[in-house]
């Protein structure tokens, strides 16, 4: 989008620059994934066009309740190898992005190279969100469960199994 603006010689105002920069941070998980030199150049362009850092932080704020809820769920995680964590949620129904956020947060912890979050996302559907810092190809693991994605970010949706059954299948695949 920034390249398009540059081609048109369009100078976005502060609000547009701020919103675009906030979107970039969301899309790249705070410049931690899917980030290239062009990503940083686009961010610099938006900063030069007066992206408001304070407003951006306000736009990206999450509620205290959501933060505390996610951290309570993260407490359920455990290590299955020296560098792989799994978090199995309770039987409540969660949004898929909640599972992804937990896996992303687990990757910020020391010694965790891959993280998997298992949770119910529909009445009869269990989802797995898989994230890796590169040491594990989570796409291959998720493909074995009829899922897909990328080497460092993948997911699967499974029907007809319990959380415990999905957890056991996942552990078997990881330990292969």
PLM feature segments, named:
Residues 1-23:
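A short, charged helix-loop
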Residues 21, 26-176:
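Hydrophobic helix-and-loop "lid/oligomerization" segment in the mid-to-C-terminal part
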């Amino acid at each position: 989008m920034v390249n398009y603006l540059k081609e048109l010689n369009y100078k976005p105002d502060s609000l547009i620059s701020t919103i675009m920069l906030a979107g970039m941070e969301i899309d790249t998980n705070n410049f931690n994934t899917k980030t290239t030199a062009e990503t940083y150049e686009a961010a610099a362009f938006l900063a030069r066009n007066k992206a408001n850092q304070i407003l951006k932080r306000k736009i990206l704020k999450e509620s205290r309740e959501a933060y505390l809820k996610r951290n309570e769920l993260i407490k359920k995680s455990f290590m299955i190898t020296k560098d792989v964590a799994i978090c199995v949620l309770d039987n409540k129904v969660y949004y898929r992005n909640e599972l992804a956020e937990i896996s992303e947060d687990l990757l910020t912890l020391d010694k965790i190279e891959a993280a998997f979050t298992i949770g119910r996302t529909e009445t009869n559907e269990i989802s797995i969100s898989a994230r890796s810092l590169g040491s594990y190809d989570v796409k291959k693991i998720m493909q074995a469960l009829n899922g897909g994605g990328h080497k460092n970010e993948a997911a699967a949706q499974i029907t007809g199994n319990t959380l415990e059954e999905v957890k056991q299948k996942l552990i078997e695949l990881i330990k292969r």
